Amino acid sequence: MRLRSKLVVLCLVCLSCLRLSAQERRNVLLSLPPFERAVVCIKHFEGLHGFKDAPYVGYGHQLLPGEHFTAAMTERQADSLLRADLMKRLMMFKDYGKDALLLAVLSYNVGAGRLLGYGKHPKSRLLRKIESGDRNFYHEFVSFCRYKGKVLRGLVKRRKVEFALFYIP
């Protein structure tokens, strides 16, 4: 009976959230501290990965050699792992000041190497533009919307949302 009452409360909360207009949802999201906003954004777009998504677990954590996380992790464990991963990426980009969180969120999805450069791949145009002081880098940011060479609408939407939430003029 106790579980049933918890489920009823959860359903009522969800229903009340559904009644919020798009503007109200945006205002609630914008009222969160920036790091929390980033966590919510990543959770929304990544979703909780299951067994078929290996080598990714939780909210998109890529398993590293020696790690033994499984897809059967709890939401709380996945949240904790996401926060730790995002904080590492934030530290990677801390020298970019007000753009650090924007770059951390992007790198969570595309990988830090795509931005910073690796091997024969040069540093991204996005970072070069930011380093030069050019604040007009919207097109460079949203250009990270390809998977296996194809533009994916879902990634275009994700980039637009990320830019709207984390770009500071």
What are these regions (language model features)?
Residues 91-102, 106:
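Short, structured surface segments that line ligand/substrate-binding pockets
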Residues 49-55:
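Short, flexible loop/turn motifs enriched in small residues
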Residues 11-20:
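Hydrophobic h-region of N-terminal signal peptides that target proteins for export
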Residues 103-113, 145:
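Acidic helix/loop microenvironments that form the catalytic cleft of cell-wall polysaccharide enzymes
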Residues 20-49, 61-66, 73-92, 114-169:
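Long, amphipathic alpha-helical surface segments
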Residues 1-8:
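Bacterial N-terminal signal peptides that target proteins for export
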Residues 56-58, 102-107, 137:
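Structural recognition of the beta-strand scaffold that forms the well-ordered cores
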